[in-house]
Amino acid sequence: MTLKIDIKGRGKYKPASDYSIDDVKNVLMEKIFEESSRIINSDDDLEIIEKVDFRTDKINVLSLFSGCGGLDLGFELAGLAAVIGEQAAMEAFKDKDRFNELRNKSIFHTIYTNDLFKEANQTYKTNFPGHVIQHEKDIRQVKYFPKCNLILGGFPCPGFSEAGPRLIDDDRNFLYLHFIRSLIQAQPEIFVAENVKGMMTLGKGEVLNQIIEDFASAGYRVQFKLLNARDYGVPQLRERVIIEGVRKDISFNYKYPSPTHGEETGLKPFKTLRDSIGDLVTDPGPYFTGSYSSIYMSRNRKKSWDEQSFTIQASGRQAPLHPGGLSMKKIGKDKWVFPDGEENHRRLSVKEIARVQTFPDWFQFSQGTNSQTSINNRLDKQYKQIGNAVPVLLAKAVASPIANWAINYLESSPNNKIKNRERKLSIRTFLRIKTS
């Protein structure tokens, strides 16, 4: 069943809201089988994965759609805290040299990353010294994945985003199938995937149902939960779906982290913009400049010092406003203005949004190597990396239960034996298994 229609200005396919549940299911299966026909045409990957630095005393991590490494850094920090203690790990995290001295003690050991974003890969290489194999290749063309204990990834979600077109027909929405293909090949004990809140309602919820079913079909007990980053010490309103799976033969019941910050008794106060960037008023570093679009001005994009930031977007132009100066003023339906003039306001700087995403100050973001492009274009590369990242402290919270389990798991399995795995299993084989 094909659901293509001609509506000027609305693209090639029906918006998700126009589909019935049966329509959604039909389109999903159609797109899944389209994805199964992707050609994987190279054996070069074998040479790459043979170089991975697999450790028998660590939880070896494979990171897909790795970006600049926010999710990976949070896991590494949680793995270090599980070994040397929370306070010692967090103190070390503030200083690059001290953290680099200790980071090899982390229970998590990243051995392989995959991403196509060149500048993000440069950032990753700068901030993750060691023996990580970086595979800058379209995941649909990666034939072999290395053995590992844990797979992480925030698979692309352009059609899931509440700010996006919300089409269930975007091919990039089905790259999660290649995440599943990596699970089938590598058979890690655990996986963690992150995505935007919008995936919960896309296609009347059927898209998420299908994704969970597909992950489970790979041999995992799967669960998901919507978490808000501000509940874990992140000065930002950022809701994300965290999908977690444990291989069915592993006796570990993952429990999502309880909030550490909030207004309830016993919790730490929410972190605010003042806590995060209040000391950068006189030295914020470079920031994106330019006029504000009508869409931008149709929303109040300014928070006060004592609030949490809006969600950081993957765009310099869409960066939230700095909290300094007067608040925006509403003058009509969906219309806001700067009462004291546009010239008295600016967007959050690269350094400020990195702080809001809880990256340490020593973490460096690449602008690329093309010095001929405009300053805004170079800065936008950094905004995109940071906005796409999982906040480090949210990642740490998600990782902590796994880190604590991992220490006992490795003690009981000192040689970290991994079952023999068939590395030639393709997405076509997965689909035959899933639909049989």
Curated annotation (Swiss-Prot):
Q: Name one Pfam family in it.
A: DNA_methylase
Q: Which named protein is this?
A: Type II methyltransferase M.BsuRI
**Catalytic activity as recorded in UniProt:** a 2'-deoxycytidine in DNA + S-adenosyl-L-methionine = a 5-methyl-2'-deoxycytidine in DNA + S-adenosyl-L-homocysteine + H(+)
Origin superkingdom: Bacteria
The EC number(s) attached to this protein equal: 2.1.1.37
- Which EC main class describes this enzyme? transferase
What is the protein's quaternary organization?
A: Monomer.
Q: Name one GO biological process term.
A: negative regulation of gene expression via chromosomal CpG island methylation
Segments traversing the membrane: none
Note the SUPFAM superfamilies from the entry. Answer: S-adenosyl-L-methionine-dependent methyltransferases
- Which NCBIfam families does the entry mention? dcm
Which CDD domains does this entry report, sorted A to Z? Cyt_C5_DNA_methylase (cd00315)
**A single MF term (Gene Ontology):** DNA binding
Q: Which family does it belong to?
A: Belongs to the class I-like SAM-binding methyltransferase superfamily. C5-methyltransferase family.
Query: Keywords in UniProt for this one?
Result: DNA-binding, Methyltransferase, Restriction system, S-adenosyl-L-methionine, Transferase
